[in-house]
């Protein structure tokens, strides 16, 4: 038999190549798909397969089903049958031969050990029995010797005992008499105590019966069956169960017309409740008729004479209704007390802790202030961060005006192309990168320079150690440059100035120094504290000097952080990835963040399922000053939130939920504060046009920046209203919300999914995609400008002087005029001026030249003008003709 390849053998046997390779491996032969198979190896495989076929099944499963019928009594005496099937399943697993041998050997060894222990126990019992017999024999001999000695002594003392017998008998009789007297006294005392207890019990029972009779109706009560003889030790529920059984036994004999009488009594109510209700109704009826006044309710409970002072526990916020419940008073009383203190409130209004404390103490209650963030503080304090601090890399934020070359500068340092890949060549996210240099590691944060990203720049300044202020040498100090200086000063971080674009012919670095000195940034050569470095991101000049300046500044700051222990840091950016879920870019400040750690991040929590660096590579841990992307949070955190590693996921969840609830309460409390200055704004609210927008963006920072920019566009006439905003693609929910609120759907670097597109098409919604924030803001401005009411402007088109006035039977006074300027048109409004003062404003009724009606009369011609509803025209008056022009306004 010739050798064949394994692939051919698989085709011949009609099995897959992988299956055949696995069978060879089970037989102890390693083969790949292209290896040849000899006849000997085929025989070995065949023998292995035969052995497997001969061996019986390893597992046996027995299933058993039993069916039964259960009758369930239903309403109206009918019963319902329910089929019940019980399934039982048992699986017997055949043991491996080697395992069976091992277990048999273990059982044999155990049996031998038990037999050996039994033999040893028998021998021990024999020894103990022998020793016991010996001890008993010795004791018997001792007892016999003692009895013999006693008999001899008794014989000797017999004579003397006879003499003392009489005296002993007398003493014993006296002792018995005293014992009998003591027993008689004790019996009498017990009878007296029992009698007193019985009298006390009778007195208590009589008093209870009397109070019960006083609290009942004055009408004759129904006789109550006395069950005290057999219900002494049973509870109320046991008595009800016994009575129920008795009724069922008695009622079972004659089911029929009287079957309803055997119904069980209602739980939780007295047996007489129905009779009481009937009597109450009868009493009301008699009271109305005025015939029977005998049935009246007597209340035995007396109202407490003095107020009850309670301990009231108050959290950080509480509603007026909850405060009233805790003090056990009506809500109206609390509202009255607040009005006395000068605060107007409703029962559902949320009030703060101080106000609630004042009100409760005013009403005479003791206040206990509850610190609701105790759990949060406990979770934060339970962290092992006691290790010694070590030097860490500086966190450097690149700031400056838009298009001044921040990303290009960082791009050259990292030797990558980031700027060309960003929309419009401008940065719209915070980018976090760490760079290894010859002198150490530096972490860079690249912030946007556009005016819309103020909050993002402020966040970058707070998380940083050093700010590198990039200023273009040909452009000088610009608005965002000034804002970046203010952020750096507010954060209290040193500034290193990088004068960029130094290779341009129109570059003027001295002008940059002069302009920056006006804002407190003085170069070192002028006696200041800021280092100025001339760089060119395009040519690469001055980059090494800039890095040296950064490291020198970091050395002066002596930056240190704890490297070991549980990590803490800040969220630089966050977004929702469709495949990976919420993703947060975290800058670690201290400790080491490991994969699998439980993190608490603002309102969100979770376990770190994966960590990636800025290059997209998986990492297992991140130390201080290292930026990483983490996956596994419960939701998208807000940019700028603190990230803390905690021990217990359950406690982290509780803290996150507490923060969400607290944020909601504070938000509601803030909304309900009615301010006087908003009153007039609310009155004119209906006259203001609104541009409703549903905004979705790729990252949290962009949502925040765009929302702030759009809200700043609002004017007194047109307001921008962000109906909904979020991170991630446009969903069907967003489209439905936009349709309900008549809003524009705006997607910034995101797209709508299939279900959302269907809703958008069916509802004909306005959907707009943007990748550059300039275009978004410009188009929203244009939409708002279209809603502005146009500006009306009056333009004078003609002026006529009245030379003579004559009467017309049809129009009254007619002014004979000479057109001195422009053109007089028939259907335009006019003003009559006398001594340059407007005395009438109206319209022309007739315009004639000679006897013909004309539409217009030009400059230098005479005409007759009839003014509608005005006859007091005099010689020398001026008639001014004007037209109203609508000018479309725009938002600056």
From Swiss-Prot:
<feature type="binding site">
    <location>
        <begin position="500"/>
        <end position="503"/>
    </location>
    <ligand>
        <name>GTP</name>
    </ligand>
</feature>
<comment type="function">
    <text>One of the essential components for the initiation of protein synthesis. Protects formylmethionyl-tRNA from spontaneous hydrolysis and promotes its binding to the 30S ribosomal subunits. Also involved in the hydrolysis of GTP during the formation of the 70S ribosomal complex.</text>
</comment>
<dbReference type="Pfam" id="PF04760">
    <property type="entry name" value="IF2_N"/>
</dbReference>
<feature type="binding site">
    <location>
        <begin position="400"/>
        <end position="407"/>
    </location>
    <ligand>
        <name>GTP</name>
    </ligand>
</feature>
<feature type="region of interest" description="G3">
    <location>
        <begin position="446"/>
        <end position="449"/>
    </location>
</feature>
<feature type="region of interest" description="G1">
    <location>
        <begin position="400"/>
        <end position="407"/>
    </location>
</feature>
<dbReference type="Pfam" id="PF11987">
    <property type="entry name" value="IF-2"/>
</dbReference>
<dbReference type="InterPro" id="IPR009000">
    <property type="entry name" value="Transl_B-barrel_sf"/>
</dbReference>
<dbReference type="InterPro" id="IPR053905">
    <property type="entry name" value="EF-G-like_DII"/>
</dbReference>
<keyword id="KW-0547">Nucleotide-binding</keyword>
<dbReference type="Pfam" id="PF03144">
    <property type="entry name" value="GTP_EFTU_D2"/>
</dbReference>
<dbReference type="GO" id="GO:0005525">
    <property type="term" value="F:GTP binding"/>
</dbReference>
<dbReference type="GO" id="GO:0097216">
    <property type="term" value="F:guanosine tetraphosphate binding"/>
</dbReference>
<dbReference type="InterPro" id="IPR009061">
    <property type="entry name" value="DNA-bd_dom_put_sf"/>
</dbReference>
<dbReference type="InterPro" id="IPR000178">
    <property type="entry name" value="TF_IF2_bacterial-like"/>
</dbReference>
<feature type="region of interest" description="G4">
    <location>
        <begin position="500"/>
        <end position="503"/>
    </location>
</feature>
<feature type="compositionally biased region" description="Basic and acidic residues">
    <location>
        <begin position="270"/>
        <end position="282"/>
    </location>
</feature>
<keyword id="KW-0342">GTP-binding</keyword>
<dbReference type="GO" id="GO:0005829">
    <property type="term" value="C:cytosol"/>
</dbReference>
<dbReference type="InterPro" id="IPR023115">
    <property type="entry name" value="TIF_IF2_dom3"/>
</dbReference>
<dbReference type="Pfam" id="PF08364">
    <property type="entry name" value="IF2_assoc"/>
</dbReference>
<dbReference type="InterPro" id="IPR044145">
    <property type="entry name" value="IF2_II"/>
</dbReference>
<dbReference type="Pfam" id="PF22042">
    <property type="entry name" value="EF-G_D2"/>
</dbReference>
<feature type="compositionally biased region" description="Basic and acidic residues">
    <location>
        <begin position="166"/>
        <end position="216"/>
    </location>
</feature>
<dbReference type="InterPro" id="IPR036925">
    <property type="entry name" value="TIF_IF2_dom3_sf"/>
</dbReference>
<dbReference type="GO" id="GO:0003924">
    <property type="term" value="F:GTPase activity"/>
</dbReference>
<dbReference type="InterPro" id="IPR005225">
    <property type="entry name" value="Small_GTP-bd"/>
</dbReference>
<dbReference type="GO" id="GO:0003743">
    <property type="term" value="F:translation initiation factor activity"/>
</dbReference>
<dbReference type="InterPro" id="IPR004161">
    <property type="entry name" value="EFTu-like_2"/>
</dbReference>
<feature type="region of interest" description="G2">
    <location>
        <begin position="425"/>
        <end position="429"/>
    </location>
</feature>
<feature type="compositionally biased region" description="Basic and acidic residues">
    <location>
        <begin position="93"/>
        <end position="159"/>
    </location>
</feature>
<feature type="compositionally biased region" description="Basic residues">
    <location>
        <begin position="254"/>
        <end position="269"/>
    </location>
</feature>
<dbReference type="InterPro" id="IPR006847">
    <property type="entry name" value="IF2_N"/>
</dbReference>
<dbReference type="InterPro" id="IPR013575">
    <property type="entry name" value="IF2_assoc_dom_bac"/>
</dbReference>
<comment type="similarity">
    <text>Belongs to the TRAFAC class translation factor GTPase superfamily. Classic translation factor GTPase family. IF-2 subfamily.</text>
</comment>
<feature type="domain" description="tr-type G">
    <location>
        <begin position="391"/>
        <end position="560"/>
    </location>
</feature>
<feature type="region of interest" description="Disordered">
    <location>
        <begin position="88"/>
        <end position="304"/>
    </location>
</feature>
<dbReference type="InterPro" id="IPR015760">
    <property type="entry name" value="TIF_IF2"/>
</dbReference>
<protein>
    <recommendedName>
        <fullName>Translation initiation factor IF-2</fullName>
    </recommendedName>
</protein>
<dbReference type="InterPro" id="IPR000795">
    <property type="entry name" value="T_Tr_GTP-bd_dom"/>
</dbReference>
<keyword id="KW-0396">Initiation factor</keyword>
<keyword id="KW-0963">Cytoplasm</keyword>
């Amino acid at each position: 038999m010739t050798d064949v390849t394994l692939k051919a053998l698989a085709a011949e046997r009609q099995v897959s190549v992988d299956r055949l390779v696995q069978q060879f491996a089970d037989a102890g032969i390693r083969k790949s798909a292209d290896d040849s198979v000899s006849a000997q190896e085929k025989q070995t495989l065949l023998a292995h397969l035969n052995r497997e076929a001969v061996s019986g099944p390893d597992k046996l499963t027995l299933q058993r089903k039993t069916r039964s019928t259960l009758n369930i009594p239903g309403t109206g005496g009918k019963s319902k049958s329910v089929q019940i099937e019980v399934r039982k399943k048992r699986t017997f697993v055949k043991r491996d031969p080697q395992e069976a041998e091992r277990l048999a050997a273990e059982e044999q060894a155990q049996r031998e050990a038990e037999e050996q222990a039994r033999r040893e126990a028998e021998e021990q019992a024999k020894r103990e029995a022998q020793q016991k017999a010996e001890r008993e024999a010795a004791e018997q001999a001792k007892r016999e010797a003692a009895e013999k000695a006693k008999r001899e002594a008794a014989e000797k003392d017999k004579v003397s005992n006879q003499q003392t017998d009489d005296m002993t008998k007398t003493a014993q009789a006296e002792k018995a008499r005293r014992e009998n007297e003591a027993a008689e006294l004790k019996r009498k005392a017990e009878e007296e105590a029992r009698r007193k207890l019985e009298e006390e019990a009778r007195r208590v029972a009589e008093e209870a019966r009397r109070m019960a009779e006083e609290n009942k109706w004055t009408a004759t009560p129904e006789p109550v069956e006395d069950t005290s003889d057999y219900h002494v030790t049973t509870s109320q529920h046991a008595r009800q169960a016994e009575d129920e059984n008795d009724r069922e036994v008695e009622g079972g004999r004659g089911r029929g017309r009287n079957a309803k009488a055997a119904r069980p009594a209602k739980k939780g109510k007295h047996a007489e409740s129905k009779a009481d209700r009937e009597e109450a109704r009868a009493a009301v009826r008699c009271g109305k008729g005025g015939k029977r006044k005998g049935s009246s309710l007597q209340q035995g409970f007396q109202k407490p004479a003095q107020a009850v002072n309670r301990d009231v526990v108050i959290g950080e916020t509480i509603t007026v209704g909850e405060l009233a419940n805790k003090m056990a008073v009506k809500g109206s009383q609390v509202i009255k007390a607040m009005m006395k203190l000068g605060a107007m409130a409703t029962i559902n209004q949320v009030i703060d802790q101080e106000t609630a404390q004042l009100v409760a103490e005013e009403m005479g209650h003791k206040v206990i202030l509850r610190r609701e963030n105790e759990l949060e503080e406990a979770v934060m304090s339970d962290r092992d961060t006691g290790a010694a601090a070590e030097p860490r890399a500086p966190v450097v934020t690149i700031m400056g005006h838009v298009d001044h070359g921040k990303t290009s500068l960082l791009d050259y340092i990292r030797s990558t192309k980031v700027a060309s890949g960003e929309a419009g060549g401008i940065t719209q996210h915070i980018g976090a990168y760490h760079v290894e240099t010859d002198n150490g590691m530096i972490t860079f944060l690249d912030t946007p320079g556009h005016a819309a990203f103020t909050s993002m720049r402020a966040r970058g300044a707070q998380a940083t150690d050093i700010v590198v202020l990039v200023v273009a040498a040909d452009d000088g100090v610009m608005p965002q440059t000034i804002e970046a200086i203010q952020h750096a000063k507010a954060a209290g971080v040193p500034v290193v100035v990088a004068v960029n674009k130094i290779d341009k012919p129109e570059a003027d670095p001295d002008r940059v120094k002069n302009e920056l000195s006006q804002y407190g940034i003085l170069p070192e050569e002028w006696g200041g504290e800021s280092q100025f470095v001339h760089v060119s991101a395009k040519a690469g000049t001055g980059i090494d000097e800039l890095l040296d300046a950064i490291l020198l500044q970091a050395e002066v700051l002596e930056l240190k952080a704890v490297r070991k222990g549980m990590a803490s840091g800040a969220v630089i950016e966050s977004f929702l990835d469709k495949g990976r879920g919420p993703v947060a870019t975290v800058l670690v400040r201290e400790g080491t963040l490991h994969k699998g750690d439980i993190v608490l991040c603002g309102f969100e929590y979770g376990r770190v399922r994966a960590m990636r660096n800025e290059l997209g590579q998986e990492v297992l841990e991140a130390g201080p000053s290292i930026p990483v992307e983490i996956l596994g949070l419960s939701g998208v955190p807000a940019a700028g939130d603190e990230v803390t590693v905690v021990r217990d996921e359950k406690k982290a969840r509780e803290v996150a939920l507490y923060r969400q609830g607290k944020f909601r309460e504070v938000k509601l409390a803030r909304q309900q504060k009615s301010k006087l200055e908003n009153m007039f704004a609310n009155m004119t609210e209906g006259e203001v046009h609104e541009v409703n927008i549903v905004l979705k963006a790729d990252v949290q920072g962009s949502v925040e920046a765009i929302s702030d920019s759009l809200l700043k566009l609002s004017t007194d006439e047109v307001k921008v209203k962000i109906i909904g905003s979020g991170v991630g693609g446009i969903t069907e929910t967003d489209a439905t919300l936009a349709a309900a609120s008549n809003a524009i759907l705006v997607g910034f670097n995101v797209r709508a999914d299939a279900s959302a597109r269907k809703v958008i098409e069916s509802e004909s919604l306005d959907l707009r995609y943007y990748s550059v924030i300039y275009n978004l803001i410009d188009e929203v401005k244009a939409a708002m400008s279209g809603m502005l009411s146009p500006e009306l402007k009056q333009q004078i088109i003609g002026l006529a002087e009245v030379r003579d006035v004559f009467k017309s039977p049809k129009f009254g006074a007619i002014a004979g005029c000479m057109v001195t300027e422009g053109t007089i048109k028939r259907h335009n409004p006019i003003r009559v001026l006398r001594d340059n003062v407007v005395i009438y404003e109206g319209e022309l009724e007739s315009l004639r030249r000679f006897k013909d009606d004309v539409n217009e009369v030009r400059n230098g011609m005479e005409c007759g003008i009839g003014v509608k509803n005005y006859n007091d025209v005099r010689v020398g008056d001026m008639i001014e003709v004007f037209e109203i022009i609508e000018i479309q306004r725009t938002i600056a």
